[in-house]
A protein has these predicted regions:
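Membrane-water interface segments at the C-terminal ends of transmembrane alpha-helices
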Residues: 1-26, 34-148, 172-197, 201, ...
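Active-site/ligand-binding-proximal alpha/beta "capping" segment
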Residues: 152, 169
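Short cytosolic juxtamembrane segments of multi-pass membrane proteins
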Residues: 154, 250-261
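Juxtamembrane non-transmembrane "cap" segments at the membrane-aqueous interface
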Residues: 201-207
Length: 261
């Protein structure tokens, strides 16, 4: 137990404590001016807003992908299952370059979308696409083992009792998946908020337009404004912690409700 706490302190707690201590170099007025500046607020809004939206999309699409992989047998299923892990293994810079090439105005998908008046690369839409790309495996790999362990006989029993397919999904299957879905959502959100490598290539990185908070931190560091960078990092840390804490509370609540179903 003591060794575990020691490693936890060295790896996580001490660096985070150092991050908070760095902000004490600023007065409250200076700290408030940094985190409420137009550029900082917009960067935080872009990062957290798009990360939340991307995590929601991944929650839905990831569940559909898991259902297809677990409940259906089709040619190429194993290959498709392996492809899901590509964002895990792919260097983020490579992912960013690939997405930018694909969605640029002369890219395979960017060209037809541009013809429809939709611009993806170098806009917040591109950030959204990149966050979906890097986040989808977290939902799939979190929910997949739970659905695999779910006994199909329970669904058959519900059907034999006259339950419709949708009633079975929402009253039998979904309640068992909710804790895993919430975990997948939290992981996808956390990854998207902190993503840097794949996003900066497709974002455009224009201040007050498509600049993400991690990039703003790097810019402040390059300007030797370490306290400013630390202040933005602390805001991201606290906000991320609150979101993940809320999701974990919902997860525990869902687990306590599962026996009722």
């Amino acid at each position: 137990m003591g060794l575990t706490l020691t490693w936890l302190s060295i790896i996580i707690l001490i660096p985070l404590a150092g991050l908070f201590l760095k902000t004490f170099e600023l007065s409250f007025d200076q700290l408030w001016a940094i985190i409420t500046s137009r550029r900082t607020l917009h960067a935080l809004q872009v990062s957290f807003g798009l990360a939340f939206a991307a995590a929601l999309v991944n929650l839905v699409m990831g569940t559909i992908i898991v259902w297809a992989l677990v409940r259906y047998r089709f040619p190429g299923r194993r290959l498709f299952d392996a492809i899901v892990d590509v964002p895990f293994a792919l260097p983020t810079a490579v992912a960013g370059v690939a997405l930018t090439s694909l969605f640029a105005q002369n890219g395979w998908l960017g060209a037809p979308l541009a013809g429809l008046g939709v611009k993806v690369a170098f806009t917040p839409v591109g950030i959204f696409v990149a966050m979906i790309f890097i986040g989808i495996p977290f939902v799939v790999r979190t929910v997949q083992p739970v659905l695999l362990d779910l006994d199909v006989e329970i669904e058959e029993a519900a059907a034999s009792l006259g339950a419709s397919r949708w009633h079975t999904v929402f009253r039998v299957i979904l309640p068992s998946l909710i804790p895993a879905l919430l975990t997948g959502f939290a992981l996808a959100f956390a990854r998207a908020v902190g993503e840097y490598g794949s996003v900066i290539f497709i974002a455009g990185n224009l201040p007050n337009v498509s600049e993400i908070a991690p990039l703003l931190i790097v810019i402040r560091l390059s300007e030797f404004r370490y306290a400013d960078a630390t202040a933005i990092a602390v805001v991201m840390l606290v906000a991320s912690f609150l979101v993940i804490f809320a999701v974990n509370r919902l997860q525990r609540f869902a687990q306590t409700r599962m026996p009722a179903h």
